[in-house]
Amino acid sequence: MCKAKVLAIIVTYNPEIIRLTECINSLAPQVERVILVDNGSNNSHLIKNIIINNLEIILLSENKGIAFAQNHGVKKGLEAKEFDYLFFSDQDTCFPSDVIEKLKSTFTKNNKKGKNVACASPFFKDHRSNYMHPSVCLNIFTSTKVICSEVDDDLYPSHVIASGMLMSREAWRVVGPFCEKLFIDWVDTEWCWRALANNMIIVQTPSVIISHELGYGQKIFAGRSVTIHNSFRNY
């Protein structure tokens, strides 16, 4: 059986170059191709100087939003018609060396159970506070949050964040691209909900827990943990 090939998409906007390079280096050995789409960064002249064998850099002239950049990268990459999976990353997450294999295994395991998997995702832990971001399942009446441990079984949330998401090419064909009317927030959530509407499932596996930073950390407000984002994202 031929090895399933993975196309990784990284979207950047004014990234820290050292951290971005670490992110790319953590992914490049695990996938067949990395496409970086920059959304009109002030330091794009530094981004284009990053040289890694299987990396292609696309510099956009302006910031058209994360959905546009992700879709642009996927469209460019799928011209080759050789990839089975798409992997999405932000600009500052460094991934463990086995993240792709573990997420592909999650796909295989669940598909063998007769589940129609759209995407598989890891869990994230904020290393500053040791806060484990929960798996979230929404319905009309309630919101259920589950904190995982490494020994737990896979969970099936209503949505996951795009960074760290491994998506099948078939899911991309069936569900369609990300909604470009949404600039930053809700892009990944809206796509996941469309996947569910197409009778596909979202899988979150505790076999992969990634250390990262989301916004400026967590604050307790009215008894709930709230993520504090930077002013650019808010306004």
Task: Report each predicted region and the residues it spans.
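Short, well-formed alpha-helical segments that are part of the catalytic scaffolds
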Residues: 10-29
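A conserved acidic beta->alpha catalytic loop
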Residues: 38-47, 62, 93
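Short beta-strand-to-loop acidic/aromatic patch adjacent to the donor-nucleotide binding site
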Residues: 83-94
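Conserved donor NDP-sugar-binding/catalytic core segment of glycosyltransferases
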Residues: 98-134
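Short, flexible, basic/aromatic active-site loop/helix in glycosyltransferases
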Residues: 137-158
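A short, conserved alpha-helix in the catalytic core of glycosyltransferases
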Residues: 165, 171, 175-176, 181-208
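Active-site-adjacent helix/loop segment of glycosyltransferases
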Residues: 201-235
